[in-house]
C-alpha cells in the first residue's frame, strides 16, 4: 500500500473502507464471522470497488460466542480474543476492520518489522495497539480496537464515516 500514496486520495480510501464495511455488514447479517479480514483479503477493482474474499477461516455464528481450539487468522490484523482462543463474535472482524482503516490512513503495513509471534504477544498479552493516527479516523479506529462488547457495529461505522468524509473533504 505504501507505493500507492500519490494515487490514493481520501475519497478513494473512504470508498474502500465503506465497501469493506458494507460487505462485512452483509456477511454478519448472514451469521458469518470472517476471522481473517485483512487488506490482502479485500480485492479492489478498476472502479475502486472493494470486495471481501477468502472465507477459508470463516465460521457460522450461533446465539452464543464461538470458541475455537486454536488461533486462526493473520496476527497483524487479528483480534486479541482470537489470539487468546477466547470466545468470539462478529466483533472480531470489527477489530480487523480497524487495522485496515489504520492502513488506509497511514498507507503503512501494520507492525512492520515485528515478527507475527511478537505481534501476538504484544496485542494479546500486553494489550499493545498500533499508534492511533491523527485526524478524523483516530477515534473510530480506537473504538474498533476496544473490548469486543464496546466495538461499534458496521452500521455505526458507516454513519461515523460520514463525519470523517466531511472532515477530509
PLM regions and their residue ranges:
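Structural helix C-cap motif within protein kinase domains
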Residues: 106-110
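Protein kinase catalytic-loop region centered on the HRD/HxD motif
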Residues: 22-32
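Conserved activation segment of eukaryotic-like protein kinases, specifically the C-terminal portion
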Residues: 68-81
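Conserved catalytic-loop aspartate of Hanks-type protein kinases
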Residues: 93
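Terminal C-lobe "cap" of eukaryotic-type protein kinase domains
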Residues: 147-169
Amino acid at each position: 500500500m505504501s507505493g500507492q500514496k500519490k494515487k490514493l486520495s481520501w475519497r478513494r480510501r473512504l470508498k474502500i473502507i465503506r465497501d469493506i464495511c458494507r460487505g462485512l455488514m452483509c456477511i454478519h447479517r448472514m451469521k458469518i464471522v470472517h476471522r481473517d479480514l485483512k487488506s490482502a483479503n479485500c480485492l479492489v477493482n478498476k472502479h475502486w470497488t472493494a470486495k471481501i474474499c477468502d472465507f477459508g477461516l470463516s465460521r457460522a455464528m450461533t446465539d452464543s460466542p464461538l470458541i475455537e481450539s486454536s488461533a486462526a487468522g493473520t496476527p497483524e490484523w487479528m483480534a486479541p480474543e482470537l489470539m487468546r482462543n477466547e470466545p468470539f463474535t462478529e466483533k472480531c472482524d470489527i477489530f480487523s476492520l480497524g487495522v485496515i482503516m489504520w492502513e488506509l490512513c497511514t498507507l503503512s503495513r501494520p507492525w512492520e518489522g515485528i515478527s507475527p509471534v511478537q505481534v501476538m504477544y504484544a496485542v494479546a498479552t500486553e494489550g499493545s495497539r498500533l499508534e492511533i493516527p491523527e485526524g478524523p479516523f483516530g477515534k473510530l479506529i480506537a473504538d474498533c480496537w476496544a473490548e469486543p462488547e464496546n466495538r461499534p457495529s458496521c452500521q455505526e461505522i458507516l454513519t461515523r464515516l460520514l463525519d470523517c468524509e466531511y472532515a477530509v473533504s
